[in-house]
Regions:
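Hydrophobic transmembrane-helix bundles of small-molecule transporters
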Residues: 50, 62, 206, 228-338, ...
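12-transmembrane solute porter fold
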Residues: 76-92, 97-99, 112, 229, ...
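Structural signature of transmembrane alpha-helices in multi-pass secondary transporters
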Residues: 122, 126, 177, 208-216, ...
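Helix-loop-helix hairpins in multi-pass membrane proteins, especially solute transporters
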Residues: 138-268, 453
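Glycine/proline-centered helix-kink
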Residues: 212-224, 277, 383, 471-476
Length: 515
């Protein structure tokens, strides 16, 4: 949390004695927020870790260093840099691995189906565990989950790098996805903890999105360089030194905030959630790869049964992993729908665009990867800009602007054919990516801001589950559009669907914003 001067907002201040014989000041401010501040400076440490946390309406109880500052400014910068870099390395790994698939198949004698599962196993475990990881942040503390997720991701990156067979690699990728599922929602929860001011938080979430955009842009380039010079295993080894530094920074500079949510563990809710999301993700992946057939009907019925059971259990549980009452808040529900739509269109279009370059134009994977860099780099500009726009105006306006620009960009790709100059394709894809990246910080901020502080972790889990589910559905549904034999017509249908989904989401946001 950034440094603050609480004196201007102080309503009541009294001195108390702590159990550690230290003198503290109890400070009640007009935020309303309660703080406990050391009466005497702690000269041995620039930061006093949080030891207790309670709610007072929307306020929080902190133990802070003398003067009321949660952190020194330089400590805060290191803490937020650690969070952003953690998200960066997760996104970097995803794009690097995609570039490495051909070399993995050649070295480990993998079939096309097994290579697809190198990606899909990670996607499945990541999507299935986001909700559980978000809940764990609220129950056990976001710093702890973030740290454990980084360590888990590093361990199974090593396992991937050492894999002697496709089976072991696919298993290691699935477990690597577990670590990623812990890092992503906990990074958002940590941002929420460090920045209680909504405008400042929106700016930081904009940087969070930019970190993902930079990773997506650099991934194909770094991956191509590593694979061509040292082999595909380097795509996994590259994670280790980065995460080693991140673990040290996390322990040193990110406070261990004491969670406010109940410590009770919703076993049935967790189990039905994981089964539902795992089966749903698996069904959509196989549907996109093989098409629909009646053999999948029993699995679909099991998914619907588990989802229904999950909702009933959560409704009746006094301390559920997923408080359904969160969806009564319009801003939270709208942001979750927008998150789904953003990833549905963007990643679905990204999939068909890569095939347009490779299958339709006949470009190599390396050249196709470079051709997609303009769209990936759009996030570097758009995410921070979207965060600042949200802070200056409002979240609904930022979502509407981003969705409108994205709808225009996606729909305009309908003019693309084999003779279209690449400069025009790059401009249109940049526009589509810009819209997505501009709207995403606002949607994420709206979800986090709409819930009580003690549910920041599960809020991050829900918005990221919505996004990840949107990605899986987008790739499957838009992928089907280009599988009918006439690639160009299918590509045009796919981008029109992507643009239409953005346009419908923009209309929904506009209606929600209207008084």
């Amino acid at each position: 949390m950034p440094a603050r001067d609480w004196s201007a907002n102080t309503l009541l201040m009294m001195e108390i004695s702590g159990a550690d014989s230290e003198k503290y000041r109890l400070v009640i401010t007009s935020q309303p927020t309660v703080l406990i501040v050391r009466s005497t400076p702690n000269k041995t440490s620039p930061i006093v870790n949080l030891v207790r946390s309670n709610s007072l309406n929307e306020g929080r109880l902190y133990v802070a260093a003398s003067g009321g500052n949660m952190m020194r400014q330089e400590t805060n910068r290191l803490a937020i840099m650690t969070v952003l870099l953690g998200f960066f390395v997760i996104m970097l790994d995803t794009t690097i691995v995609n570039v490495s698939l051909a070399h993995i198949g050649k070295d480990l004698h993998g079939t096309t189906a097994s290579l697809q599962w190198v990606v899909d196993a990670y996607t499945l475990s990541f999507a299935a565990l986001l909700l559980s990881a978000g809940t764990a942040c609220d129950r056990l503390g976001a710093q702890r989950i973030y740290l454990f997720g980084l360590i888990l991701f590093a361990l199974f990156s090593i396992a991937c790098a050492l894999s002697p067979s496709m089976g072991i690699l696919i298993s290691a990728r699935a477990l690597q996805g577990v670590g990623a599922a812990m890092v992503v929602p906990s990074s958002l929860a940590l941002i929420s903890e460090m920045y209680s001011d909504h405008k400042e938080r929106a700016k930081i979430i904009g940087l969070w999105g930019a970190a993902g955009g930079i990773a997506a842009a650099l991934g194909p380039i770094i991956g191509g360089l590593l694979v061509s010079t040292t082999g595909w295993r380097a795509a996994f080894w590259v994670n280790i030194p980065i995460i080693a530094v991140l673990v040290i920074l996390t322990i040193s500079f990110i406070p261990r905030w004491v969670p406010q949510a109940s410590n009770s563990f919703d076993v049935l809710g967790q189990t039905t959630s994981i089964i539902s999301l795992s089966l749903l993700t698996y069904l959509v992946i196989t549907w996109g790869e093989c098409g629909w057939n009646t053999a999948q009907l029993p699995a679909l019925l099991v998914v619907l049964l588990c989802m229904g059971l999950f909702l009933i259990l959560e409704w009746k549980n006094p301390t559920p992993m997923l408080p359904l009452t969160l969806f009564k808040t319009q801003a939270f529900s709208i942001s979750s729908i927008v998150g789904f739509c953003l990833n549905f269109s963007f990643f679905g279009q990204l999939f068909v665009l890569s095939l347009y370059f490779q299958k339709y134009l006949g470009w190599s994977p390396w050249i196709a990867g470079l051709a997609m860099v303009p769209q990936a780099t759009s996030a570097i500009v758009a995410s921070p800009l979207g965060g600042r726009f949200s802070a200056k105006f409002d979240l609904y306006s930022a979502m509407f602007v981003g969705l409108s620009v994205g709808a225009l960009g996606f729909s305009s790709l309908v003019v693309v054919n084999e003779s279209t100059p690449y400069v025009l394709v790059a401009l249109l894809t940049f526009c589509a990516g810009f819209g997505m990246a501009f709207a995403m910080p606002a949607a994420t901020s709206a979800a986090i801001n709409a819930v009580p502080y003690e549910f920041a972790g599960i809020a991050g889990g829900i918005i990221n589950t919505a996004r990840q589910t949107g990605s899986v559905f987008g790739v499957a549904i838009l992928g089907i559009m280009i599988a009918n034999g006439n690639f160009l017509a299918g590509f045009h249908h796919a981008v029109l669907i992507a643009g239409s989904v953005f346009a419908l989401a923009a209309i929904l946001v506009m209606l929600a914003k209207a008084p």
